[in-house]
């Protein structure tokens, strides 16, 4: 991991009006996307890796000796898309094969932070599920957490704090060790390290877990849960429960808010931000195409949205790919992107001193 990188010349607001993206090649645009000071709120640390990193883990542990590199990537990852969120979750569970020991988990955290820095992210909220990382090899969640915190801290310090990183804890469903109550207890035990609490995995109506989420929220940990992502669900109950029962401050994905004017009005009134993950939504078939992705409708309706990469290891993408897609297919401008990042900064769960520093430096 080569820490020595050219510093990024981040865009200033007064520069934007002089940049004509329409006259640029794709390669030139990517240089601009990198220069946007990005605040990313929704990325799963346990699914944030490059193809090279993932393949090195597979080969190190001799996991698929009879498969070529291309076959390994097809077997585990979702870069070519699929049929549904359910299919994605099943593949993500396969990826837990690489969580073989604490060394690889620490290395994963280091690479994730460094790659986000190279992409031009200045404020990064990673989230991870202790039980998901632990379940395949029965690892100790305390030692997992120590490895992740150590890896993040080491790289942030090597980068002279040019990227600010925080963690959210996920209580999930969909694998044998999933236990939302245990994850909530773990989150509160390590509240010095976690800035928020989430639910991930299969999208379910979380009102059945109201007491657990109340317990976390009333203990001072804000909530952002996955809801309004899975278009195969027959109704919008997950969104209503997240907003009215759990009293979340943000929603992971939330794109199905676009299906209800009542929900649009509700998230605006309650100042709830939607952590939108455009490429993820298309690859999981929760949006039919990027041209028809609901983020355009939501943004135009005045809903606060931000741009996120979700599971870049599964998709073999990075956050700048999402910006390119939104520009190319939905005509979002640099001004729009700067506004979305200001919203993300405003709604970040990080300490106000860090947020003020980022705001003064970049916005």
Swiss-Prot record:
UniProt KW keywords: Hydrolase, Metal-binding, Purine salvage, Zinc
Pfam families: A_deaminase
UniProt-annotated binding residues for Zn(2+): 42, 44, 226, 310
Catalytic activity, EC: 3.5.4.4, 3.5.4.31
Annotated InterPro entries: A/AMP_deam_AS (IPR006650), A_deaminase_dom (IPR001365), Ado/ade_deaminase (IPR006330), Metal_Hydrolase (IPR032466)
PROSITE patterns: A_DEAMINASE
GO cellular component: cytosol; external side of plasma membrane
Cofactor dependence: Zn(2+)
Cofactor note: Binds 1 zinc ion per subunit.
Listed pathway(s): Purine metabolism; purine nucleoside salvage
Gating helix loop: annotated segments: 170-184
GO biological process terms, semicolon-separated: adenosine catabolic process; hypoxanthine salvage; inosine biosynthetic process; negative regulation of adenosine receptor signaling pathway; purine ribonucleoside monophosphate biosynthetic process; purine ribonucleoside salvage
MF term (GO), any: metal ion binding
Binding, a purine D-ribonucleoside: 44-46, 172, 201, 229, 253, 310
Reactions catalysed, as given in the entry: adenosine + H2O + H(+) = inosine + NH4(+); S-methyl-5'-thioadenosine + H2O + H(+) = S-methyl-5'-thioinosine + NH4(+)
Activity regulation comment: Inhibited by coformycin and methylthiocoformycin (MT-coformycin).
Site feature location: Important for substrate specificity for S-methyl-5'-thioadenosine: 172
Functional description taken from the UniProt entry: Catalyzes the hydrolytic deamination of adenosine to produce inosine. Unlike mammalian adenosine deaminases, also catalyzes the deamination of 5'-methylthioadenosine (MTA), a by-product of polyamine biosynthesis, to produce 5'-methylthioinosine (MTI). Plays an essential role in the purine salvage pathway which allows the parasite to use host cell purines for the synthesis of nucleic acids.
Similarity section: Belongs to the metallo-dependent hydrolases superfamily. Adenosine and AMP deaminases family.
Protein name: Adenosine deaminase
Organism of provenance: Plasmodium cynomolgi (strain B)
Lineage start: Eukaryota, Sar, Alveolata, Apicomplexa, Aconoidasida
Gene that encodes the chain: ADA
């Amino acid at each position: 991991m080569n820490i020595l990188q050219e510093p990024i010349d981040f865009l200033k607001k007064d520069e934007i009006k002089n940049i004509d993206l329409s006259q640029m090649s794709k390669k030139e645009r990517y240089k601009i996307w990198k220069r946007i000071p990005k605040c990313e709120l929704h990325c799963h640390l346990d699914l944030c890796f490059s193809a090279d990193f993932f393949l090195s883990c597979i080969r190190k542990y001799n996991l698929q000796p009879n498969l070529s590199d291309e076959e390994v990537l097809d077997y585990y990852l979702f870069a070519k898309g699929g049929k549904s969120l359910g299919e994605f979750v099943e593949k993500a569970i396969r990826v837990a094969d690489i969580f073989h020991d604490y060394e690889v988990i620490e290395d994963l955290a280091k690479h994730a932070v460094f790659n986000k820095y190279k992409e031009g992210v200045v404020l990064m909220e990673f989230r991870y599920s202790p039980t998901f990382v632990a379940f395949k090899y029965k690892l100790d969640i305390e030692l997992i957490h120590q490895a992740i915190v150590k890896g993040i801290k080491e790289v942030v310090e090597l980068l002279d704090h040019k990227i600010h990183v925080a963690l959210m804890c996920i209580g999930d469903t969909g694998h044998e060790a999933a236990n939302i109550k245990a994850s909530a207890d773990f989150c509160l035990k390590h509240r010095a390290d976690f800035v928020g609490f989430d639910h991930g995995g299969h999208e379910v109506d979380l009102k059945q877990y109201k007491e657990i989420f109340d317990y976390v929220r009333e203990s001072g940990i804000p909530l952002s849960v996955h809801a309004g992502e899975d278009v195969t669900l027959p109704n919008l109950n997950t969104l209503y429960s997240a907003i009215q029962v759990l009293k979340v401050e943000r929603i992971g994905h939330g794109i199905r808010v676009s299906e209800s004017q009542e929900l649009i009005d509700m998230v605006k009134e309650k100042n709830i931000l939607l952590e939108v993950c455009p490429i993820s939504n298309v690859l999981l078939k929760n949006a039919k195409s990027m041209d028809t992705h609901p983020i355009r409708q939501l943004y135009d309706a005045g809903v606060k949205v931000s741009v996120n990469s979700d599971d870049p290891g599964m998709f073999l993408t990075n956050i700048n790919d999402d910006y390119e897609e939104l520009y190319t297919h939905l005509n979002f401008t640099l001004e729009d992107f700067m506004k979305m990042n200001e919203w993300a900064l405003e709604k970040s769960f990080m300490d106000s001193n860090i947020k003020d520093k980022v705001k003064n430096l970049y916005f």
